[in-house]
A protein has these predicted regions:
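One-carbon transfer enzymes
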Residues: 1-272
Length: 272
């Protein structure tokens, strides 16, 4: 029996870590429906040289690729099924079916994680509390992809590893912040465990943010990112072989780093 009967709809990706988050939420709250964005794209034929280059890259940087692959396997083993609730699978989160499915449920809260960029009319769908999003990076300092934790390691910015829960808007990780927290991963045994630490922290922060929203009344925490600090948007095309080399080198030297820089974070209010 859900502790709180207010209805939640989850918009999420299809990866095992999203399935884990959905199960954690459903174990505590009334998840009334889930829309799974399967990110289906039109396939394009690659040149043989591109295939060979990609294969060499994966072999050369297998520790990086392997860490994420292990994390997904770990979650797939722990959460074999999605919660037993109404579910819709779409090729894109912006499919009209996703909007219709959500309208029919009329949720109090919409929770977003791991989808493509959400656009109208979904952004304007009614929800009495609102639409919130998980960013597995510390906003406003680190945004984009392919992985904010990896960028922090490559840049030797260990103090910027963390997670953010924000109100969803039309930008890329630009919504007003509900809460942020940093996490120190330097004592992790390997990259696999480091990514597991960050993802588990992300799920825990999401659950605490939902609890905050459900146990308080408006106005909720809503901190403009520009009032917290300045950051950088990273694009996948910027994630070069040189950056991957730096990640591996910095990971090996992580114990030599002292976390001196202090940045502003946004704690959850103790009470409204």
């Amino acid at each position: 029996m859900a502790v709180d009967e207010r209805k939640i709809v989850i918009w999420c990706g299809a990866a095992p870590n999203q399935k884990a988050l959905a199960n954690k939420l459903a174990s505590k709250y009334n998840v009334a429906g889930i829309v799974i964005d399967e990110h289906k794209k039109t396939s394009t034929r690659k040149k043989f040289s591109e295939i060979v280059s990609a294969l060499i890259d994966r072999i050369k940087f297998r520790k990086i690729y392997g860490a994420w692959k292990w994390l997904m396997y770990n979650y797939a083993s722990g959460y074999s099924e999605w919660p037993n609730v109404p579910m819709l699978r779409v090729e894109s989160i912006n499919n009209e079916q996703a909007a219709a499915f959500t309208r029919e449920i009329n949720p109090d809260l919409i929770i977003v994680s791991g989808t493509g960029l959400v656009k109208e009319p979904l952004l304007s769908l009614p929800a009495s509390i609102g639409i919130i999003n998980l960013h597995t990076g510390l906003s406003p300092y680190v945004k984009g992809g392919p992985n904010c934790t990896n960028w922090c390691i490559a840049n030797n910015e260990w103090h910027l590893v963390g997670n953010t829960i924000m109100w969803l808007n039309a930008g890329i990780d630009t919504g007003n912040i509900i809460t942020t927290e940093a996490i120190d991963i330097r004592n992790a045994a390997d990259l696999q465990q480091a990514h597991k630490m960050v993802m588990e922290h992300a799920h825990d922060l999401y659950l605490r943010a939902v609890e905050y929203l459900f146990t308080n009344t408006k106005p909720y925490n809503s901190v403009p990112q520009q009032s917290v600090g300045k950051g950088k948007l990273y694009l996948t095309k910027m994630w070069t072989a040189e950056k991957r080399k730096l990640l591996l080198q910095n990971w090996e030297d992580r114990k030599k780093i002292t976390l001196v820089p202090v940045v502003n974070t946004v704690p959850l209010p103790l009470e409204n």
